[in-house]
Design a protein with these regions (language model features):
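Carbohydrate-interacting regions of secretory-pathway proteins
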Residues: 21-233
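Positively charged n-region of N-terminal signal peptides that target proteins for export
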Residues: 1-5
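Bacterial N-terminal signal peptides
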Residues: 7-16
Length: 233
């Protein structure tokens, strides 16, 4: 699905809300800048996540995730992130499981990757292995817009390096995910095997900071029970 079509779809959704008297969607904070309220630790430790000076700090150890309290279906996620270490690895999962059953400690879902720019050099990976890759993780499958195997690579490298803030705008509608990095849409996947689930922030070996985490919930679509992840216990 092209970006223009997706934007039109969102526009129609908003117009529908106005025409039918439904509350017009707006961005609402997922992080209050003071506490971890609204988030649930899944499989990390009490020292993994903390708040300092309005910033959500992730130590990077152990590997695992923290999830949102509720599930989301159609939405726009706005999030800023900054790596503190060269080659740092992290990400945010959308439409994710609320529990982890995999040996590598990460959930099934659609991952929006956040890699520090030196990652390919430090770990001797291909240049395409950079921030902004999108892919189905675990049991979740997607169709990449810009294939690198099962992953979708960004068409333009726009992320800033360690010590600098980056902004992701993640649009998730009816199994389609589109990613804007620092003000420009550069990647997408479609045909996700799940269309409703949790948001998860990832701890994966390096300190990373998050701030200004907001979500705009959009009207729901037609969805099968098999496309909704189970409620976490």
């Amino acid at each position: 699905m092209k970006i223009g079509i997706l934007v039109q779809m969102i526009g129609w959704m908003l117009l529908h809300c106005v025409a039918t008297g439904i509350e017009t969607p707006e961005f609402k904070p997922l992080f209050d800048g003071k506490t971890l309220d609204g988030w649930v630790d899944v499989n990390t430790s009490p020292d993994t996540w903390s708040v300092k000076d309005g910033v959500l700090v992730c130590s990077g150890t152990p590997i695992g995730v923290m999830r949102s309290e509720k599930q989301y279906e159609n939405f726009i996620l706005s999030i800023e992130w900054m790596h503190l270490e060269a080659g740092g690895n992290s990400g945010v999962f959308v439409w994710s499981e609320g529990e982890v059953f995999r040996e590598n400690r990460l959930p099934s879902g659609v991952e929006v990757q956040m890699l520090e720019n030196d990652y390919p050099k430090i770990y001797n990976r291909v240049r395409e292995y950079v921030s902004g890759e999108l892919f189905g993780a675990g049991t979740v499958t997607t169709i990449p817009d810009h294939p690198r195997g099962k992953r979708s690579s960004s068409v333009e490298y726009r992320c800033k390096g360690k010590g600098e803030w980056n902004h992701y705008l993640v649009v998730c509608v009816d199994g389609v995910v589109k990613l804007s990095i620092n003000g420009k849409f550069v990647n997408g996947v479609r045909g996700s095997s799940v269309k409703k689930g949790y948001l998860c922030l990832e701890s994966e070996g390096a300190q990373i900071h998050f701030r200004n985490i907001e979500i705009m919930e959009l009207p729901p679509g037609v969805i099968k029970a098999s496309e909704i992840v189970p409620l976490a216990k």
